[in-house]
Amino acid sequence: MTRRVVITGVGVRAPGGSGTKEFWDLLTAGRTATRPISFFDASPFRSRIAGEIDFDAVAEGFSPREVRRMDRATQFAVACTRDALADSGLDTGALDPSRIGVALGSAVASATSLENEYLVMSDSGREWLVDPAHLSPMMFDYLSPGVMPAEVAWAAGAEGPVTMVSDGCTSGLDSVGYAVQGTREGSADVVVAGAADTPVSPIVVACFDAIKATTPRNDDPAHASRPFDGTRNGFVLAEGAAMFVLEEYEAAQRRGAHIYAEVGGYATRSQAYHMTGLKKDGREMAESIRAALDEARLDRTAVDYVNAHGSGTKQNDRHETAAFKRSLGEHAYAVPVSSIKSMGGHSLGAIGSIEIAASVLAIEHNVVPPTANLHTPDPECDLDYVPLTAREQRVDTVLTVGSGFGGFQSAMVLHRPEEAA
């Protein structure tokens, strides 16, 4: 019999919301946390706004040695891991460490630290300084994405399977999906899974400027992210992280754990079509949705809330709307759909995990977060996108989806354990 997998611990760092309470308060208030970039002089760029996080590593309990050793994204992942473990009440010291695994996602990993090291080594780009004295001894840690899950494993006391997932904006959803698959198959009893990204740096901002994917609405940062709105013109870049404790359902029950949700189904597909473009018909995302529902043994009408990718680009939101109609049929018009990127921006590889956190909290509190800044509906996005105001309703089952550059399309079904077939 396939083992059931549940989420028993959550840790979040998101713009405007560090910790599950602050994060959920932000979402349910429909409050935005996007602002002018403060990390560097962004005046030369087309898009000069972001979802930044006020994060003090020392105040978060990191030692000076850890601060030196860990990149900012890694610090986010470890901070969320500590929170998730504390939230779960799981005593990892009492477990066989070889049965504890880690799955971590990130789209750009330590790109910001690599950029900083380049500036040091090149005298801000003027001259290449080959003297190793100019190079940080932490350079290898920044260069190797595998260091991020290694640090999480260290924090969790995990000596089981450790996986790094980097497939763009679906990384955070896929890392949890792969963790669930491994736990079901018996390769681990507990997996700490999630994602972290800190892409607010000149090189990453410039990358998205070059393809005009980010919004130039710099005069109105708080209202710049407008998923599904007819006036949307790109996403707002953000940083963030979310980590979860996943464990086998019966083990969680035996120890009296608080269960946020069961991961009923997960699926991913690739369009194999274009690096940044999307097919208009949404076929591959629709296939992921149907496969995730099939794995969860749930009919499409069981979905109470769809946590959309909703990036705020013209093509994504129309593509996604088509996918929902294709996979959910008439139920697509009845179920509430919203995008939390409207409030905190798009944290690339981390956003899938952050959206899982929002999904399990929606189940926990029976509230659907709104889509902020949705004032002018797009005729091609004609579903119920929960504009402006959160909605109280029974939420037993959530479908959360992700779409990433490269054509990756992923879907996950989360539900109350008692709703399992």
Curated annotation (Swiss-Prot):
SMART domains membership: PKS_KS (SM00825)
SUPFAM superfamilies in alphabetical order: Thiolase-like
Domain of life: Bacteria
Any one of the GO BP annotations: antibiotic biosynthetic process
GO function term, MF aspect, one: 3-oxoacyl-[acyl-carrier-protein] synthase activity
Keywords per UniProt: Acyltransferase, Antibiotic biosynthesis, Transferase
Disulphide bridges: none
Keyword Transferase in annotation: yes
GO terms under cellular component: cytosol
Residue ranges occupied by any Ketosynthase family 3 (KS3) domain in the UniProt entry: 2-416
InterPro entries attached to this UniProt entry: Beta-ketoacyl_synthase (IPR000794), Ketoacyl_synth_AS (IPR018201), Ketoacyl_synth_C (IPR014031), Ketoacyl_synth_N (IPR014030), PKS_Beta-ketoAc_synthase_dom (IPR020841), Thiolase-like (IPR016039)
One Pfam family cited in the UniProt record for this chain: Ketoacyl-synt_C
Catalytic machinery residues: 169, 309, 346
Entry EC no(s): 2.3.1.-
Biological pathway: Antibiotic biosynthesis; granaticin biosynthesis
The family this protein is said to belong to: Belongs to the thiolase-like superfamily. Beta-ketoacyl-ACP synthases family.
Stated name of the protein: Granaticin polyketide putative beta-ketoacyl synthase 1
